[in-house]
Amino acid sequence: LCIQQAFYLALQKKKKVLVLDMDGQGNTSSRLAPRRELEDGDYEPILTGTKTAELFAYELDGIEVMHCPCGADLIHTPKNDPDLFEMEAVPLDQAMNPARHLAELFENYDYVLIDCPPSLGRKLVAALVMSTHVACPVKLSGFAVDGVEGLLNTIIGVREAYNQDLEILGIVINDMDRSVNHDKALKSLENTVPDLLFENKIMHRPPLDTATTDGIPVWELRYGHVAAKEVEAVLEELLEKVG
């Protein structure tokens, strides 16, 4: 969702956007960054500037953002970055460093999007400490409710301890299909956290997978209009909640 949101804000809304990739897999970085074509026809991202893992240092000599083809700026994470995975072992006070280093830079942007791993750990804490709002995209499964409860408890804990202005926008149902299992999981969430569910949902749509994998806006795909409509509805609802 973060990748399509970056495209939407930068290209459709013409906003000044910074994306901070805090997921060690680096998928957002590889899709947004400039790319070069390899001999086998595949592509590899050209990653420059400050890495997300470097933000955890106590001292940092300036931050260099990367300019992406879509118009957004990016602080990147290389694919499966061991340096960022290692940040899970740092002392809790070190997770406060990115917020300290980035505060001034954030002032230059209309929106800052932080892509976070779904796991509860230092990277999530670091992201929540410097956020104004948080939205949780959730894939439905038998464990969706357990996962959401754990995540919400962490968010509330971080809010109480470090960032009392943090606002929980809610839960976005992502990649939903018409199966009995998904329907059951959705009903379970509706019973557990009814006030937190976004009205709009993103269904399982192959064009959205294709667009995200290829690093292009879903609305640019000829056959992607249904997926594009759903993504746009969710993003508009999100922007409305942010106000």
Residue ranges of predicted features:
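P-loop NTP-binding core
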Residues: 1-243
